Amino acid sequence: MTVISRVEHLPARPASRVAWVPAAAGWTVGVIATLSLIASVSPLVRSLIRVPREFVNDFIFNFPDTSFAWAFVLALLAAALAARKRIAWWVLVLYLVGAIGWNVGDLAAGGDTVADDIGELIGIAFHVAAIVFLVVARKEFWAKVRRGALLKSAAVLVAGNLIGIVVAWGLLQAFPGTLDPEWRLPYAVNRVSGFATVPTEVFEGYSHTFLNAIFGLFGALALMAAAIVLFQSQRASNALTGEDESAIRGLLELYGKNDSLGYFATRRDKSVVFAPNGRAAITYRVEVGVCLASGDPVGDPKSWPQAIAAWLQLCQAYGWAPGVMGASLAGAEAYRAAGLNALQLGDEAILHPDRFRLSGPDMRAVRQAVTRARRAGTSVRIRRHRELSPEEMAAVIRRADAWRDTETERGFSMALGRLGDPADDDCLLVEAVQGDEVVAMLSLVPWGSNGVSLDVMRRSPRSPNGTIELMVSELCMQAEDIGISRISLNFAMFRSAFEQGAQLGAGPVARLWRALLVFFSKWWQLESLYRSNMKYQPEWVPRYACYEDARLVPRVGVASVIAEGFLVLPFSRRNKQHTGEHIAAPDTLVQSGRLHRDGSAPDVTGLQGELPDADDEPRLPEQVRVRMAKLKALQGNGVDAYPVGQPPSHTVAQALGATDGETLSVAGRVMRIRDYGGVLFAQLRDWSGEVQLLLDNAALTEGETADFTATIDLGDLVEVTGSMGFSRNGTRSLLVERWRLIGKCLRPLPDKWKGLTDQEARVRARYVDLAVNTEARDLIRARSGALHAIRETLYSKGFLEVETPILQQIHGGANARPFLTHINAYDLDLYLRIAPELYLKRLCVGGVERVFELGRAFRNEGVDFSHNPEFTLLEAYQAHADYNVWIDGCRELIQNAAQAANGAQVFLRPRPNDPAGTLEPVDISGQWAVKTVHDAVSEAIGEHITPETELGELRRLCDSAGIPYLTHWDAGAVVLEMYEHLVEDRTTEPTFYKDFPTSVSPLTRPHRSIPGVAERWDLVAWGVELGTAYSELTDPVEQRRRLQEQSLLAAGGDPEAMELDEDFLQAMEYAMPPTGGLGMGVDRVVMMITGRSIRETLPFPLAKPR
């Protein structure tokens, strides 16, 4: 038997000079078949072509005047020749050889006229030439034919012909024409089953012309019935076997979480072809010479190319045109990579229950429909198929059949076609119930482990309006309880055409295309499917059809219509049970015994072990593979490479200070190994330090040094027990008595001397950097010490530490672009906070007089050496104080942090004119300089400015200094721009700049004595702003006015402007005491203390995706 799903890798066929022969032969025979068919039904055509037809019929090719049967045979032969079928080549060659013999026999017999002799010679020449071309091009006819039930098909053909002959004979008895009685039966045989090959002149008399057409039709019907039986048997015998379905179910469990249509691959009237490694498969059906694949390949995406290649080789081997229905974007890209073209068919409607809400204007239609159904007393019941008794499932099937609005079940790529099968007990049944009567139902197949995909939708004609909407809504509402997070509804074909054609201003082509689709929707429900899905506001996911050549699109379309059940062929049936006779699953899986003959899913763990690795799976580095092999060997010997933890008695630092001879244990990472045979030295590092291990066979109580070298690699975590002592050269060492592996390192550490030299690698692999780089550990310690010192300083002054919301409904407290997120529980957009200020001030209103928060803030802005989107911010507020109080307070916080991190009140700064960037300490003790903003700008620009300086004068100074500004800025904004360019960027040692313009300080109190400025200062050091403080604005009326101005800016498109926070303003109206507030960027302070960039001081700064 031919097993069509196991295909050898066929090489690409080289271009040939005679590649045109199959198409030419097919076209030639097809023209004769077409003319024969037309002549059989049209006396006019029969009369017009009589002379050439008789010449062709007598000398070249059988071409009777009327024969539906012969036209059908020639049509099959033409299609087979064009499809490069080897059997068609044999049939045509043998026919031509027979025709040569016929003509040669006539010539040898003699007695013909000269015209007949010439015709026979022309016929012989034509036949010889045709045979030569066919023989030369024989390799172009490579396509095989699937085995089928030949005997059954032949029996149908014989029975059909016998019936046709008997009926034809009876008609001739009734309407004999001029035929003699003894010639009537042979005449019927010739016309029904002999394709009218015997010339009419042989018979004594003639029959009526219309009877000739009827007799040919009898023969054609017999041939059609035989062909249908043959094709059905081919499909049935090559459909899924139980083992194939079992393998597909296993692949779905391993890899099917992303394909909503994956479960439909188990449909049993499909065939399947597997990738050679068995990790992927494609299910398909053959219709009208098109091998139609169903959706994406099933299985490991890495093996999709191999599965597609095997499928295309299958198409080539049998001369089928490849086509795909319902591929996803990923699947279409995989097919396109294999040489196919893709065309978007439409979109699949996906619902996400966590986002589904009946509220809102967009859901009004659904909400009203659900309300109507509920008022009619309809409730919803949701169960898995396995929860139904056999009697209940039988009732479900009866209702589904009774409510179906078509004679047959439709579907191919997006339907299962076997409701109630025991193998599908994980399917979900949703029923609408009125009283005790079920009035509608949905059946959904599994989509991975947490999704469902719609298979069957039925409703009773007596169901109330809104029943379907109620079932879908209840399914979404109860999804969390039944473990569902995604639902695939119907597929809307040509959705974009409906949507675009209905838009205002749509072009004439779009409107015409939509009108055509609306017209055809009367039969095929195109528009109704789109509208029934659209009202749920789904996510639309495109689905594609794939084809090899644009000329094949109509054939692929017809094959799809047939496969989906929109065009039902005579005697067609859809198999619900296994009919396949040839197992397509790889032999290794079949022989493993893990596949089940009933089609149920195999043991996934065992199946995964039987599947070889994907051919294109990237190979691990050699050192990793060696270490993995060592780990496997250790586990095979019963060694637990990752045991439960036991605290060592000492850290490395404590061990180094312990007395000699004292038994102790330490744990850490092995950084170096030096093996001298019987004595071995290793460097062990923990967080506190590094110690040398000395392993001597004479001192070890368990095992030998060779065991250590065989087991331990650099980077492994070990625990050792022994006592402190000295090596022969006097190095302080831990004399090891026993050891154990507590963590196998599967990847090698970087260079033991240089460590990670690439800065990007240090960011991405901070854990490795910390393991090998003491400098990285020092930075972590410095940061921790600085944070601790800041907290302790504030605690010592009586401040309370609090935590305020990070998720906020309104972004405020600073001018910055926020991050936006969404909370599904309330269907509400939220911001990650840009500052905790507004919540801390609420606490001040409530009477918390000294409060601070040290936490994370988020700003969707640039990233550079001093900026990170996620950063640590200190905000502190002290009642009955002003901004001057915080000059000393901020300085003390930073000096204490520097003391804790560096052991002295110093910043580390790069040494001037040093290319190596060597850091040197800069003293920051004592008082720091304090200047007003306007004085500092005046010093920098060389002209005196004050808060009263006119805007025009400020613009003139900007122009002369080359400082850009925007025309809508006021004087305060221009002064701020001058300050940032001329003062802030050029500042070195820590300096407080105070009294900023009021217009750029919306939350700050106006200066008590100087109009136009606010009581605010910024602390700047070496061009970096470290902190800012305010005399807070406590006047609620003025505060409202300023925030309203900010909200207008936000409404005008300024992404950094603050929104109006009505709750905050109402809190302020309860009166907040005079307060001084401080904001300090802790990351930047640590950056200055350590002399590093902000990314280096953060344990895990944000890094771009690889």
Curated annotation (Swiss-Prot):
Details of cofactor binding: Binds 3 Mg(2+) ions per subunit.
Cofactor: Mg(2+)
Membrane topology listed for this record: Multi-pass membrane protein
Molecular function GO terms recorded: ATP binding; lysine-tRNA ligase activity; magnesium ion binding; phosphatidylglycerol lysyltransferase activity; tRNA binding
Major subcellular site: membrane
Region (Lysine--tRNA ligase): 604-1106
A Pfam family assignment: tRNA_anti-codon
Ligand binding (Mg(2+) 2): 1025
Catalytic activity: tRNA(Lys) + L-lysine + ATP = L-lysyl-tRNA(Lys) + AMP + diphosphate; L-lysyl-tRNA(Lys) + a 1,2-diacyl-sn-glycero-3-phospho-(1'-sn-glycerol) = a 1,2-diacyl-sn-glycero-3-phospho-1'-(3'-O-L-lysyl)-sn-glycerol + tRNA(Lys)
Keyword Transmembrane helix in annotation: yes
EC number: 6.1.1.6, 2.3.2.3
Keyword Cell membrane: yes
Ranges for region Phosphatidylglycerol lysyltransferase: 1-603
GO process annotations (BP): lipid metabolic process; lysyl-tRNA aminoacylation; response to antibiotic
Entries under InterPro entries matching the protein: Aa-tRNA-synt_II, aa-tRNA-synth_II, aa-tRNA-synth_II/BPL/LPL, LPG_synthase_C, Lys-tRNA-ligase_II, Lys-tRNA-ligase_II_N, Lys-tRNA-synth_II_C, NA-bd_OB-fold
Binding-site positions, Mg(2+) 1: 1018, 1025
Keywords of the record: Aminoacyl-tRNA synthetase, Antibiotic resistance, ATP-binding, Cell membrane, Ligase, Lipid metabolism, Magnesium, Membrane, Metal-binding, Multifunctional enzyme, Nucleotide-binding, Transferase, Transmembrane, Transmembrane helix
Segments passing through the bilayer: 18-38, 59-79, 87-107, 117-137, 155-175, 210-230, 307-327
Coiled coil regions, renumbered to chain: none
Family: In the N-terminal section; belongs to the LPG synthetase family.
Annotated PANTHER family: LYSINE--TRNA LIGASE, CHLOROPLASTIC_MITOCHONDRIAL, LYSYL-TRNA SYNTHETASE
Protein task: Catalyzes the production of L-lysyl-tRNA(Lys)transfer and the transfer of a lysyl group from L-lysyl-tRNA(Lys) to membrane-bound phosphatidylglycerol (PG), which produces lysylphosphatidylglycerol (LPG), one of the components of the bacterial membrane with a positive net charge. LPG synthesis contributes to the resistance to cationic antimicrobial peptides (CAMPs) and likely protects M.tuberculosis against the CAMPs produced by competiting microorganisms (bacteriocins).
Record-given protein name: Lysylphosphatidylglycerol biosynthesis bifunctional protein LysX
